[in-house]
């Protein structure tokens, strides 16, 4: 047998390395140019974001200034792709002292036809918050640390004992059509609620929501996303008085993790909301984020809960999963609570069925799937 020369071996090694680099780059390009394939975001013409962006409308950003510039740049009709590398501190190390200051410096408005994707496993937004108010937006493979309002407001009429309330969610989808949130992690992160102390006899809450959908937003899918360590998580529909939301707020949340989430996972008004293959884990006696309820059944809500897995210590029965907030219908099919079938007595006449194709896992397969795949850094 003739042995290859050193030159030939080196050429072969170089070719292998080059092919691996090309494959890696190709895989990353696929992440940035993917379009929505599941849930409500596939309807109304689909959700494509900046998947067809021209090369000169693709930005890689590593700091707040670059991110803001990419969001504000004038681009062509095919939109933009913004690739986030590493941790971005939107405050640039200058702490917010007032709510107004946080609004002025921390707000990140996402234009229509935009894809935002983390390209490193540690891609993260801190000290900032996203607003999606324009159509056709995709956010993937990113950690968002829930914003911390420096000036919570006391409301003596909130509940029987009053409460502290704050502004700003990690992501607010407001009035926009066709939004896909995929493999994103939302967390209180470095500032958990036990660090905030109390005032007026109540915990001083510096967080608002993690991800809210409101004011007529429509055709939204949240997939393989992780929500961790948060109190009031997802609000779909902001007010009982917004009757114009009826027929809108079509949202799918699937194969997502809710870990130590106290409430609003999600709380719904008006919307046709499909919740399937989600894994909820927590405890009614958790020292910081005690479980209160998962699905809030609000005015004219039409929730279809399907094959979700709830592992919540200290609770039993559907009334602790589906909380009554003024709604009248709720359909669950095939979900489990602590390993046994969830049985609900709500009227299941929600009046709609999903118009898109999907193949849900059985509830006993959900935990393994979600823990392996949900959240930032886990796109296959």
Curated annotation (Swiss-Prot):
Active site: 264
Cofactor note: Binds 1 Ca(2+) ion per subunit.
InterPro entries attached to this UniProt entry: Pec_lyase, Pectin_lyas_fold, Pectin_lyase_fold/virulence, PEL
Region forming the signal peptide: 1-29
GO BP: pectin catabolic process
Catalytic activity from the UniProt record: Eliminative cleavage of (1->4)-alpha-D-galacturonan to give oligosaccharides with 4-deoxy-alpha-D-galact-4-enuronosyl groups at their non-reducing ends
Region (Disordered): 189-209
Metal-binding recorded as keyword: yes
One example GO MF annotation: pectate lyase activity
Cofactor list: Ca(2+)
Residue ranges of coiled coil: none
Amino-acid positions noted as binding Ca(2+) in the UniProt annotation, renumbered to this chain: 169, 208, 212
Pfam families with a match to the protein in the record: Pectate_lyase_4
GO cellular component entries: extracellular region
Keywords for the protein's UniProt record, in alphabetical order: Calcium, Lyase, Metal-binding, Secreted, Signal
Pathway: Glycan metabolism; pectin degradation; 2-dehydro-3-deoxy-D-gluconate from pectin: step 2/5
Top class in the EC scheme: lyase
Family classification: Belongs to the polysaccharide lyase 1 family.
PANTHER family associated with the record: PECTATE LYASE 18-RELATED (PTHR31683), PECTATE LYASE 21-RELATED (PTHR31683:SF18)
Role noted for this protein: Plays a role in bacterial invasion of plants.
Name this protein carries in UniProt: Pectate lyase
